[in-house]
Amino acid sequence: MKRSALILSFLPLVFGCDNPKSPGHSCASVYSVSSAAASSFCATFTASTVTATTGVPEALLSNCDYKTKHLSSACSCLGTAAVPTVATPSSVSSVYITSATATPTSFTFKTSTAHIVKVAKAATSSTAVVTTPVSVPTASSSFTGNGGTTCTVTEYAAISSAVASCSNILLSDIYAPPSSTIDLQGLQTGAAVIFAGKTTFGDTADSDFDPIVVSGTSVTITGVEGHVIDGNGAAYWDGQGSNGGSDKPDHFFVVKDMYNSRIENLYIQNWPVHCFEIESTEHLTVSGLTLNNSAGDAANSKSDGDPAAHNSDGFDIKESSYFTLENTWVHNQDDCVAVTSGTDIVVDGMYCYGGHGLSIGSIGGKSDNTVNGVTFSNSQVISSQNGCRIKTNSGETGEVYNIRYENITLSDISDYGIDVQQDYLNGGPTGEPTNGVTIANVTFVDVTGTMSDGKDYYILCGDDSCSNFVFDGVSITGGSGDSCNYPSTGCP
């Protein structure tokens, strides 16, 4: 037996009436939001006795187009409690919420009791409709925006239809089967996607498989309190990441062709290799995320004593402009943030633990090899291999300029506090820098902290390929054997 559910997110119920224009029209909306005032008004108002708008409350009047017909129709909606016959949808997996609230720009969720209308098609093809109360996430008064339909999806199969037809999408306890991407590429302009419960994935041994993909314009991606997105990393971790071993999804959460949008307040754990790939975005802000890959620190039967997770970058950013990453916590085993191309990028308020620090690069050998205007600021790098790093690939070309590290605190760094090297290869540095990638206008301000081992400073530039480095208030201690072939004055 197939069944679906239609959740009406406002009370009292508005059923079986001539709702002005559409279910999301502001006239019906203001009646439902201000039900007490509307009920008092409707008790004395009918279209047959009132033909003018004199004395009508302004809030009702303005939202009903100053028309008595709409006022009367909305009053009828408010007082009607009859439940209509509802055709059985073909999908069994979605819960649709009809709401006059709009696409949110900020989210505060609460749990309230709404009415759920369950539709079940019996063997005789007759349609049975029952109404029962159920707790569902609904928006508080701060849930504001441009209106539209909100859909709650509880099964993977319903995601595509929700993306195509809904302004606001709540993904609740989604399980994505093997080889099944949570595909959010067709979102409506201004849409919001909210993760709730635990999102999980089946095993997909394929390096080209992307578990989550999102794109869109003026889109918001967020999560309710207590949600978890679990990447099933333990099924893949073998200590080799993308460098070898078994096939595994290379990028867990792909964000591409996304404009004037926000990703905020997500909790992600146990991703297989790289977590976020940010590609070809403009005016995107990522804020308040927690990326927790701490389970990958431990060795397993495949990793030969090394951490099981490898190449587990938090954020790989490329070909993007006016991008902001802020107030985010990352525990991983590779770059906390790596910018490989792009312009006007701000990374602020980061807490990076266990990985390879705040990085530019590696640069060279890609379709876009220019980085211009990147600021890392007000961040901590803890128990990591590197603090602040710029790495360019040996024998390649490109340009890196206008880079700023400011107010960065380092603690328990094992390899390099500040590292600029032009001999990088994924398999290990060559020790022989090349000058095909130029690095210019790099400023380190108030970069301070301690090493557990390694070098406080390591700068290895090619011939005449580095210029205009500034060190101001830089103090890193605890390491030894510092080496800087640029500037001519040596290490800070």
Curated annotation (Swiss-Prot):
Instruction: Tell me the compartments it is located in.
Output: Secreted
Its Gene Ontology cellular component terms are:
extracellular region
Q: Where is the active site?
A: D334, H356
Repeat (PbH1) residue spans along the chain: 216-238, 258-280, 281-319, 320-341, 371-392, 400-422, 434-478
Cysteines joined through disulfide linkages: C151-C166, C336-C352, C461-C466, C484-C491
Q: Which UniProt keywords apply?
A: Cell wall biogenesis/degradation, Disulfide bond, Glycoprotein, Glycosidase, Hydrolase, Repeat, Secreted, Signal
> What is the superkingdom listed in this entry's lineage?
Eukaryota
- SMART domains recorded for this chain? PbH1
Q: What's the chief localization of this chain? A: secreted
Tell me where the signal peptide lies. Answer: 1-16
Stored PROSITE patterns:
POLYGALACTURONASE (PS00502)
Annotated InterPro entries = Glyco_hydro_28, Glycosyl_hydrlase_28, PbH1, Pectin_lyas_fold, Pectin_lyase_fold/virulence
Record: glycosylation sites: N292, N407, N441
- Supply the EC number(s): 3.2.1.15
Q: Pfam families from the entry? A: Glyco_hydro_28
UniProt lists the family membership as follows:
Belongs to the glycosyl hydrolase 28 family.
Function noted in UniProt: Involved in maceration and soft-rotting of plant tissue. Hydrolyzes the 1,4-alpha glycosidic bonds of de-esterified pectate in the smooth region of the plant cell wall.
Q: What is this protein called?
A: Probable endopolygalacturonase D
